[in-house]
Curated annotation (Swiss-Prot):
GO biological process, one term: regulation of DNA-templated transcription elongation
GO molecular function terms attached to this record: DNA binding; RNA polymerase binding
SUPFAM superfamilies for the chain: FKBP-like, GreA transcript cleavage protein, N-terminal domain
NCBIfam families associated with the record: greA, PRK00226.1-2, PRK00226.1-4, PRK00226.1-5
Main function: Necessary for efficient RNA polymerase transcription elongation past template-encoded arresting sites. The arresting sites in DNA have the property of trapping a certain fraction of elongating RNA polymerases that pass through, resulting in locked ternary complexes. Cleavage of the nascent transcript by cleavage factors such as GreA or GreB allows the resumption of elongation from the new 3'terminus. GreA releases sequences of 2 to 3 nucleotides.
UniProt xrefs under Pfam families: GreA_GreB (PF01272), GreA_GreB_N (PF03449)
Signal peptide: none
Naturally occurring in which organism (per UniProt): Mesorhizobium japonicum (strain LMG 29417 / CECT 9101 / MAFF 303099)
Descriptive protein name: Transcription elongation factor GreA
InterPro entries reported in the protein's UniProt record: GreA/GreB_C_sf, TF_GreA/GreB_CS, Tscrpt_elong_fac_GreA, Tscrpt_elong_fac_GreA/B, Tscrpt_elong_fac_GreA/B_C, Tscrpt_elong_fac_GreA/B_fam, Tscrpt_elong_fac_GreA/B_N, Tscrpt_elong_fac_GreA/B_N_sf
Length: 157
């Protein structure tokens, strides 16, 4: 069973989603099924079929969350240090073409959110960054073509 690296924040988020799905969403769906069942004939009852589908999707996600939580390897980023980029690092990059600064934290696949500056450890940019240090230049093949960046700061916060 492969371990899934994630930050403490990502782990807490998964546990909260699991709690919500089990303690709030599951009872709501059961109530919807019960309500739809009371309408009679199930063969042509769209509400019933929609509720059963919602139940299936919810239970599938519950199973997925339980698996991820069981395989989680929680990494306390605040206890990491060093000059090289690794999981959990917050990296400040400068685009070599536009001189625009970008800040990314390298996190687990499940907690990635580019809008929040959190990129997946398996993303092309994170893979290019791993093992590099301040002053190094990287090139990332992006959908719009290759982009060059220089690492200006690496921190573990």
């Amino acid at each position: 069973m492969n371990k899934v690296p994630m930050t403490g924040e990502g782990f807490a988020s998964l546990k909260e989603e699991l709690r919500w799905r089990q303690q709030e969403e599951r009872p709501r769906i059961i109530e919807a099924i019960s309500e739809a069942r009371s309408h009679g004939d199930l063969s042509e009852n769209a509400e019933y079929h929609a509720a059963k589908e919602a139940q299936s999707l919810n239970e599938g996600r519950v199973n997925e969350l339980e698996d991820l939580i069981a395989r989680a390897e929680v990494i306390d980023v605040t206890k990491l240090s060093g000059d090289k980029v690794k999981f959990g690092a917050t990296v400040v990059l400068v685009d070599e073409d536009t001189e625009e600064k970008k800040t990314y934290q390298i996190v687990g696949d499940q907690e990635a959110d580019v809008k929040s500056g959190r990129i997946s450890i398996s993303s092309p940019i994170a893979r290019a960054l791993i093992g590099k240090e301040v002053g190094d230049a990287i090139e990332v093949n992006a959908p719009g073509g290759a982009r060059g960046y220089e690492i200006v700061q690496v921190q573990f916060i």
